Amino acid sequence: DYLAYSHNLYFDIDTIRFFVSGFAASHFEILEGLSGTGKSSLPRYFGKFTGANVLFMPVQATWRDKSNILGYFNEFSKTYTETEFLSALYKANYEPDAINIYVLDEMNISRVEYYFADLLSVLEYPTEDWKIKLMNFPHDFVPPVKLEDGYIRIPELSYFVGTANRDDSTFTITDKV
C-alpha cells in the first residue's frame, strides 16, 4: 500500500512473487512490457525495501560491446577507463554479504547480445566461476587489489534485471538471451 499511496504505483502480489521467485531460478531477469508500466520501478523499490544496493544503467543505442559496461584500457594513457557498473562491481567484492541488483534500463534499445555477451555467458557457470576478463596487464601495470590476472569476480549475491520496452524503437530480444 505504501507505493500506491506515496508514488501512485501498484504491483499485485503475483507480480512481486514472480519477481522474487525469478531470482531463485536465475540471477538475470527481463521485465518486458509497454512503456510506463513500472518495469524500472519494481527493482528500484524492491531494492529499497530489502536494503539491496541497486545500480541503474540506462542503456544507450550506441552500445556495441562490453566496454560500454566494463570500461576499457587506454593504451595511450596506460589507464583503465572504468564505468559506474565496474566501480559498483569492484565495491561489491568488498561486501560479499550485500545483495547487489544491477538494472539495465531499456536494455533492448541496443542489441543485448553485443554489449552483455560476456555477462550472459558467465552467468551460466557455477557461481564460483563468475569472473570476467577485463584486460591483459601491460608489463609495468600495477593492478587493483581485487583483480586476479585481469579478471574481476562477480559476487554470488549479484542479480541483473533488464527492462525492455515493446515498441518500434527497440530490438527484439533473441532466444539466446
Language model region names:
Residues 1-177:
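AAA+ P-loop NTPase catalytic core and its hallmark functional loops
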